[in-house]
Amino acid sequence: MVADSDGFRQLGADRLVSYAARRMTVLPIEFLRDSFPKLFARGMEVLENRAAAGDARAQRILDDVKGVTGAASLQIDDEPPVILSAQQGSLSAGDAPADQVPIRIMAALPGDALQLLLGEVAKAGALEDEEVAVGAAQTASKRFEDALAGRPMTCHITIADVPSLGNIDVRVGFNVSTLPAEPGFTTELRFPDLESVQRGELTVQDLFLGGKLKMEGDYSLALQIAMQLLTNPL
C-alpha cells in the first residue's frame, strides 16, 4: 500500500484528517488505529458511489485499491508499531498484520511533529472534504506494488521549514524486514513547495524535474517508478 501522486497531494499536512463520526483524534497512535481506517473506508464509499454513477476514473481507482494485499508497519517514536493491513479494498489496524497479509512497507515517524500537524488539521475542519477521504484510500495502490515488483527500497525523507516544527524526518522502507540505519537514498522537500503542490501551483513532475526535491544516494529505482506512474496516470 502506498499513496500515488494524487494521494500524496490530497493527504498533505493541511489535509490529513479522520472521518470518525465527525471527530478526529490528534494522538498519532489513536489516529492510525481508529481514525485513518475510517477515513479510508469513507474514501472507498465515495469512490463506489462515483463509479456507480458512471465515473470511469473512480472505477479505475477502485480496481487499483482493491488489488492490494499488503500491510504497512508504522512506528511512532519508540512505541510498538501500528500495522495497517489492506486487502480487497478494506483497511484494518492492529498489532500484527491480518492473516496472510505480508508487510510491504515500514516507516518510523516522529510523534511530537505528527501530533502537532494533526492538531492543525483538526482546527482546519477538513472533515467534509470527500477528496481527502479518496486520497486516504489511494494510499493502497496495486500499480505501485507492481512497479516496485518486490524490490527493496529504503529512504530517509526530510520535510524542511515546517512552521513551528522546523524539519521533520521520516524513515521509510519497502519490501524490507527492518529499517536500515543508512538508507538507499535521502530526499528533502521544503514545506512551502509541498503547499504549492496542494494548491495546484506545482505538480509532482515539477518537484522531480525542477530541482525541488534534493535527492542523494541511489534513487534510480524511485525515479523510475515515479516517472512510470506519473506518465501513465489512472
Question: Where in the sequence are the language-model features?
Answer:
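Feature captures hydrophobic
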Residues: 2-234
